[in-house]
Amino acid sequence: MSKAMIGKPAPEFTATAVVDGDFKSISLSDYKGKYVVLFFYPMDFTFVCPTEIIAFSEHVGEFKKLGVEVLAASTDSQFSHLAWINTPRKQGGLGEMKIPIISDNNHQISRDYGVLKEDDGIAYRGLFIIDPKGILRQITVNDLPVGRSVTETLRLVQAFQFVDKHGEVCPAGWTPGADTIKPGVKESKAYFEKH
Protein backbone atom coordinates (compact mmCIF):
# COMPACT_ATOMS: atom_id res chain seq x y z
CA MET A 1 0.00 0.00 0.00
CA SER A 2 1.22 3.48 -0.86
CA LYS A 3 2.55 5.62 1.95
CA ALA A 4 2.54 8.68 -0.32
CA MET A 5 -0.32 11.05 0.49
CA ILE A 6 -0.84 14.71 -0.36
CA GLY A 7 -0.32 16.92 2.67
CA LYS A 8 1.62 14.23 4.54
CA PRO A 9 5.38 13.67 4.89
CA ALA A 10 6.94 12.12 1.81
CA PRO A 11 8.19 8.58 2.43
CA GLU A 12 11.85 8.72 3.46
CA PHE A 13 14.41 6.66 1.59
CA THR A 14 18.12 6.01 1.33
CA ALA A 15 19.47 4.41 -1.84
CA THR A 16 22.41 4.28 -4.19
CA ALA A 17 22.29 6.73 -7.07
CA VAL A 18 24.50 7.59 -9.99
CA VAL A 19 25.67 11.16 -9.39
CA ASP A 20 28.21 12.79 -11.71
CA GLY A 21 29.23 9.40 -13.09
CA ASP A 22 29.86 7.80 -9.69
CA PHE A 23 27.87 5.81 -7.12
CA LYS A 24 26.66 7.75 -4.10
CA SER A 25 24.28 6.98 -1.26
CA ILE A 26 21.55 9.61 -1.09
CA SER A 27 18.55 10.10 1.19
CA LEU A 28 15.47 12.23 0.79
CA SER A 29 16.47 13.93 4.05
CA ASP A 30 19.62 15.24 2.28
CA TYR A 31 17.29 17.68 0.51
CA LYS A 32 15.35 18.96 3.53
CA GLY A 33 14.83 22.70 3.21
CA LYS A 34 14.46 22.54 -0.58
CA TYR A 35 11.70 21.64 -2.95
CA VAL A 36 12.24 18.25 -4.55
CA VAL A 37 10.86 16.87 -7.80
CA LEU A 38 11.12 13.08 -7.58
CA PHE A 39 10.13 11.22 -10.71
CA PHE A 40 10.02 7.51 -11.41
CA TYR A 41 10.40 5.89 -14.81
CA PRO A 42 9.91 2.26 -15.87
CA MET A 43 13.26 1.01 -17.20
CA ASP A 44 16.70 1.89 -18.48
CA PHE A 45 17.43 1.38 -22.18
CA THR A 46 13.84 1.98 -23.28
CA PHE A 47 12.16 4.53 -25.52
CA VAL A 48 10.11 7.21 -23.74
CA CYS A 49 12.27 7.17 -20.60
CA PRO A 50 15.38 8.80 -22.09
CA THR A 51 13.30 11.65 -23.54
CA GLU A 52 12.00 12.50 -20.06
CA ILE A 53 15.25 12.06 -18.17
CA ILE A 54 17.24 14.08 -20.70
CA ALA A 55 14.59 16.83 -20.68
CA PHE A 56 14.66 17.11 -16.87
CA SER A 57 18.47 17.03 -16.86
CA GLU A 58 18.72 19.73 -19.53
CA HIS A 59 16.31 22.00 -17.60
CA VAL A 60 17.90 21.41 -14.19
CA GLY A 61 19.28 24.98 -14.20
CA GLU A 62 15.72 26.36 -14.25
CA PHE A 63 14.80 24.14 -11.31
CA LYS A 64 17.95 25.11 -9.37
CA LYS A 65 17.11 28.83 -9.82
CA LEU A 66 13.88 28.05 -7.97
CA GLY A 67 15.72 26.15 -5.22
CA VAL A 68 14.46 22.80 -6.51
CA GLU A 69 16.37 19.52 -6.66
CA VAL A 70 15.39 16.96 -9.30
CA LEU A 71 15.79 13.22 -8.68
CA ALA A 72 15.03 10.37 -11.08
CA ALA A 73 14.45 6.76 -9.99
CA SER A 74 13.76 3.34 -11.43
CA THR A 75 13.97 -0.25 -10.23
CA ASP A 76 17.10 -0.87 -12.32
CA SER A 77 20.48 -1.30 -10.63
CA GLN A 78 22.99 1.51 -10.33
CA PHE A 79 25.19 -0.49 -12.73
CA SER A 80 22.48 -0.42 -15.38
CA HIS A 81 22.03 3.32 -14.80
CA LEU A 82 25.75 3.92 -15.24
CA ALA A 83 25.90 1.82 -18.41
CA TRP A 84 22.95 3.79 -19.83
CA ILE A 85 24.58 7.11 -18.94
CA ASN A 86 27.78 5.95 -20.63
CA THR A 87 25.86 5.07 -23.82
CA PRO A 88 25.80 7.91 -26.37
CA ARG A 89 22.45 9.63 -26.87
CA LYS A 90 22.47 8.81 -30.59
CA GLN A 91 22.43 5.15 -29.57
CA GLY A 92 19.54 5.54 -27.11
CA GLY A 93 21.68 6.35 -24.10
CA LEU A 94 21.49 9.25 -21.69
CA GLY A 95 24.94 10.77 -22.01
CA GLU A 96 26.00 13.28 -19.37
CA MET A 97 23.44 13.68 -16.60
CA LYS A 98 22.98 16.69 -14.33
CA ILE A 99 20.55 14.92 -11.99
CA PRO A 100 20.96 11.90 -9.69
CA ILE A 101 19.46 8.65 -10.95
CA ILE A 102 18.41 6.47 -8.03
CA SER A 103 18.50 2.67 -8.03
CA ASP A 104 15.41 1.21 -6.37
CA ASN A 105 16.37 -2.37 -7.14
CA ASN A 106 14.61 -3.76 -4.05
CA HIS A 107 11.43 -1.91 -5.18
CA GLN A 108 10.81 -0.41 -1.73
CA ILE A 109 10.84 3.25 -2.79
CA SER A 110 8.50 2.59 -5.72
CA ARG A 111 6.21 0.59 -3.44
CA ASP A 112 6.21 3.31 -0.74
CA TYR A 113 5.32 5.94 -3.34
CA GLY A 114 2.56 3.76 -4.82
CA VAL A 115 4.01 3.50 -8.32
CA LEU A 116 5.30 -0.09 -8.41
CA LYS A 117 3.77 -2.26 -11.12
CA GLU A 118 4.08 -5.38 -9.00
CA ASP A 119 3.60 -7.95 -11.76
CA ASP A 120 6.49 -6.53 -13.83
CA GLY A 121 8.71 -5.16 -11.04
CA ILE A 122 8.91 -1.74 -12.69
CA ALA A 123 7.68 1.72 -11.73
CA TYR A 124 4.89 3.63 -13.40
CA ARG A 125 5.73 7.20 -14.42
CA GLY A 126 5.10 8.79 -11.03
CA LEU A 127 6.03 12.41 -10.34
CA PHE A 128 6.07 13.91 -6.85
CA ILE A 129 6.63 17.48 -5.69
CA ILE A 130 7.88 17.66 -2.12
CA ASP A 131 8.14 20.98 -0.28
CA PRO A 132 11.02 22.18 1.93
CA LYS A 133 9.32 20.71 5.02
CA GLY A 134 9.23 17.27 3.39
CA ILE A 135 5.48 17.40 2.71
CA LEU A 136 4.06 15.93 -0.49
CA ARG A 137 2.31 18.66 -2.43
CA GLN A 138 1.64 17.04 -5.81
CA ILE A 139 1.34 13.52 -7.21
CA THR A 140 0.78 12.44 -10.81
CA VAL A 141 1.10 8.95 -12.20
CA ASN A 142 1.11 8.20 -15.91
CA ASP A 143 0.66 4.84 -17.57
CA LEU A 144 3.84 3.55 -19.19
CA PRO A 145 3.52 4.84 -22.80
CA VAL A 146 3.14 8.59 -22.10
CA GLY A 147 5.92 10.90 -20.92
CA ARG A 148 5.64 13.93 -18.66
CA SER A 149 6.11 17.65 -19.24
CA VAL A 150 9.05 19.51 -17.73
CA THR A 151 7.27 22.80 -18.45
CA GLU A 152 4.20 21.73 -16.48
CA THR A 153 6.36 20.50 -13.61
CA LEU A 154 8.13 23.88 -13.45
CA ARG A 155 4.75 25.65 -13.49
CA LEU A 156 3.45 23.52 -10.63
CA VAL A 157 6.54 24.15 -8.50
CA GLN A 158 6.25 27.90 -9.13
CA ALA A 159 2.57 27.80 -8.17
CA PHE A 160 3.25 25.99 -4.89
CA GLN A 161 6.08 28.40 -4.11
CA PHE A 162 3.80 31.37 -4.79
CA VAL A 163 1.07 29.97 -2.53
CA ASP A 164 3.59 29.26 0.23
CA LYS A 165 5.05 32.77 0.05
CA HIS A 166 1.91 34.86 -0.51
CA GLY A 167 -0.99 32.81 0.88
CA GLU A 168 -3.05 33.34 -2.26
CA VAL A 169 -4.26 30.47 -4.45
CA CYS A 170 -3.52 29.84 -8.12
CA PRO A 171 -6.34 29.29 -10.63
CA ALA A 172 -6.28 26.80 -13.49
CA GLY A 173 -3.44 27.39 -15.92
CA TRP A 174 -1.77 29.96 -13.65
CA THR A 175 1.70 31.08 -14.67
CA PRO A 176 4.07 33.43 -12.82
CA GLY A 177 2.86 37.02 -13.07
CA ALA A 178 -0.77 36.07 -13.69
CA ASP A 179 -3.58 36.97 -11.31
CA THR A 180 -4.12 34.86 -8.22
CA ILE A 181 -7.10 34.52 -5.91
CA LYS A 182 -7.35 35.64 -2.31
CA PRO A 183 -8.99 32.72 -0.52
CA GLY A 184 -12.24 33.80 1.06
CA VAL A 185 -15.81 34.30 -0.06
CA LYS A 186 -15.61 38.09 -0.24
CA GLU A 187 -11.93 38.39 -1.13
CA SER A 188 -12.16 36.02 -4.10
CA LYS A 189 -14.76 38.18 -5.83
CA ALA A 190 -12.06 40.64 -6.95
CA TYR A 191 -10.55 37.89 -9.12
CA PHE A 192 -13.88 36.68 -10.49
CA GLU A 193 -15.01 40.19 -11.40
CA LYS A 194 -11.90 40.57 -13.59
CA HIS A 195 -12.10 37.15 -15.22
Swiss-Prot record:
Alphabetized InterPro entries for the sequence: AhpC/TSA (IPR000866), Peroxiredoxin (IPR050217), Peroxiredoxin_AhpC-typ (IPR024706), Peroxiredoxin_C (IPR019479), Thioredoxin-like_sf (IPR036249), Thioredoxin_domain (IPR013766)
Spell out the GO cellular component terms annotated for this protein, sorted alphabetically and separated by semicolons: cytosol
A molecular function GO annotation? peroxidase activity
User: Which positions are catalytic residues?
Assistant: C49
Q: Which GO terms describe its biological process?
A: cell redox homeostasis; hydrogen peroxide catabolic process; removal of superoxide radicals; response to oxidative stress
| Pfam families assigned | 1-cysPrx_C (PF10417), AhpC-TSA (PF00578)
Enzyme class, UniProt record, top EC level: oxidoreductase
Q: What is its EC number?
A: 1.11.1.24
List the PROSITE patterns: THIOREDOXIN_2 (PS51352)
Entry keywords, A to Z: Antioxidant, Disulfide bond, Oxidoreductase, Peroxidase, Redox-active center
According to the entry, every stretch annotated as the Thioredoxin domain falls at: 4-162
Catalytic function, reaction form = a hydroperoxide + [thioredoxin]-dithiol = an alcohol + [thioredoxin]-disulfide + H2O
According to the record, the segments passing through the membrane are: none
Misc. remarks from the entry: The active site is a conserved redox-active cysteine residue, the peroxidatic cysteine (C(P)), which makes the nucleophilic attack on the peroxide substrate. The peroxide oxidizes the C(P)-SH to cysteine sulfenic acid (C(P)-SOH), which then reacts with another cysteine residue, the resolving cysteine (C(R)), to form a disulfide bridge. The disulfide is subsequently reduced by an appropriate electron donor to complete the catalytic cycle. In this typical 2-Cys peroxiredoxin, C(R) is provided by the other dimeric subunit to form an intersubunit disulfide.
Main function: Thiol-specific peroxidase that catalyzes the reduction of hydrogen peroxide and organic hydroperoxides to water and alcohols, respectively. Plays a role in cell protection against oxidative stress by detoxifying peroxides and as sensor of hydrogen peroxide-mediated signaling events.
Q: How does it assemble?
A: Homodimer; disulfide-linked, upon oxidation.
Entry's family note: Belongs to the peroxiredoxin family. AhpC/Prx1 subfamily.
Protein's recorded name:
Peroxiredoxin
Organism for this UniProt entry: Ascaris suum
